[in-house]
């Protein structure tokens, strides 16, 4: 008797996503374990972090997560899904996957470039 899969932090992407799993971008923290995320089509979802990982995984704004919507499809509920994966750097492994949305690939490239340039500026400013 196996337990239902909760969530995890992962540097390695899964080979494929199931039917009701989507890649989403974290837009806003709504509570201790609730996050507002946006799919690549612009649809906003309210998702929750599984209780097992609430104090162990840090989700940052403008980061990416894999959301499972299957559990909440038939329920009349405010919550639209559960976070399965928290995408961590390096993003290049994730962006190579066929399920990674093109809209997010462009955004994540720009985000990484700006982070690298700001960190290099800080190094020069400290002299």
Curated annotation (Swiss-Prot):
Main location: cytoplasm
Localisation per UniProt entry: Cytoplasm; Nucleus
Positions of modified residues (Phosphoserine): 126
One Gene Ontology CC term in the entry: cytosol
Keyword RNA-binding set for record: yes
InterPro entries per UniProt: EIF1AD, NA-bd_OB-fold, RNA-binding_domain_S1_IF1, TIF_eIF-1A
SMART domains: eIF1a (SM00652)
Keywords: Cytoplasm, Nucleus, Phosphoprotein, RNA-binding
Region span, Disordered: 107-127
GO terms for biological process, alphabetical: cytoplasmic translational initiation
Family annotation (Gene3D superfamilies): Nucleic acid-binding proteins
Molecular function terms, GO-annotated: RNA binding; translation initiation factor activity
Sequence ranges of Acidic residues compositional bias: 113-127
Pfam families, alphabetized: eIF-1a (PF01176)
Family designation: Belongs to the EIF1AD family.
Protein's name in the database: S1-like domain-containing protein C146.08c
Organism: Schizosaccharomyces pombe (strain 972 / ATCC 24843)
